[in-house]
């Protein structure tokens, strides 16, 4: 029997790639979307697939009414709002998207689902093994995991998976992240500003992340909190220097400091048998040599 999967946050980079991957499998996707997304070209294209069903809503009571009509086996929560700003307007949106919305969906479907897959951030553990949020966004991500713990108490039938991410990258990435910024600024012949020449980051290709999701869906994976990371951190200055040796036109870069940034994030369990075989340098060369 086809697994019935509900996904939130599908308009984002991670969510859209998970949908793309899962629609190739023997599953039916229910996609929770605000009504304003109804006429988007991407959604119209997805609706041509018989295994894709959008669920449009404006108010939570509408969403509750629609979700109670369908059978769902698994929730994949990709809904997220990210900003570094902690002003009143952004705090409200951070809490609304990253805590309240996700909690409402879980409350509505708690008696139906078998698995709940959630994405967190290693920004929650920026200074060591204890909770040390880098920003308010990290606070909201951590807070929703505490909401999950509340639901675990009376819903032993649900397996919860919390996947903590550093950085993801891949095709068609429009986010204001370092990898798409390198590509965009190079093609526009603009300088790239890097916060420190000693910046080190951990990157996972989106295809490797979707493989993790498929493993959780189709295999017996122990529930829990996992870090999805590459085996090695990459020094950005070293990466750019290596690229520049292979490019006719060099990447223009300005390092804003030499501040040493330590990646001492919480030592979480690595996801079983995870291996990101993608090569970031090869990916970048392919993109900027188009």
Question: Can you describe what each PLM-predicted range is?
Answer:
Residues 8, 72-78, 118, 227:
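Rossmann-fold scaffold of SDR-type NAD(P)-dependent oxidoreductases
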């Amino acid at each position: 029997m086809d697994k019935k999967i509900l996904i939130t946050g599908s308009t984002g980079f991670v969510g859209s790639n998970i949908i793309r991957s899962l629609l190739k499998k023997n599953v039916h996707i229910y996609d929770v979307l605000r009504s304003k997304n109804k006429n988007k070209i991407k959604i119209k294209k997805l609706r041509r697939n018989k295994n894709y069903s959008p669920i449009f809503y404006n108010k939570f009571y509408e969403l509750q009414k629609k979700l109670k009509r369908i059978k769902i086996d698994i929730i994949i929560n990709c809904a997220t709002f990210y900003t570094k700003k902690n002003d009143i307007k952004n705090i409200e949106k951070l809490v609304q998207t990253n805590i309240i919305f996700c909690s409402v969906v879980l409350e509505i479907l708690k008696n139906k689902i078998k698995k709940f897959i959630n994405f967190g951030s290693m920004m929650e553990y920026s200074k060591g093994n204890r909770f040390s949020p880098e920003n308010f966004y990290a606070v909201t991500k951590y807070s929703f995991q505490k909401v999950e713990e509340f639901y675990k108490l009376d819903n032993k039938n649900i397996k919860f998976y919390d996947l903590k991410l550093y950085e993801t990258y891949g095709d068609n990435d429009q986010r204001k992240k370092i990898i798409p910024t390198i590509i965009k600024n190079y093609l526009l012949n603009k300088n790239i500003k890097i916060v420190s020449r000693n910046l080190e980051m951990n990157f996972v290709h989106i295809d490797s992340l979707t493989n993790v999701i498929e493993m959780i869906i189709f295999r017996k994976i122990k529930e829990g909190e996992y870090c999805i990371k590459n085996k090695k951190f990459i020094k950005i200055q070293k990466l750019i220097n290596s690229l520049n040796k292979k490019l006719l036109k060099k990447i223009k870069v300005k390092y804003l400091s030499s501040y040493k940034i330590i990646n001492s994030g919480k030592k979480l369990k690595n996801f079983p048998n995870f291996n990101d075989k993608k090569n970031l340098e090869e990916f970048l060369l392919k993109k900027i040599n188009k």
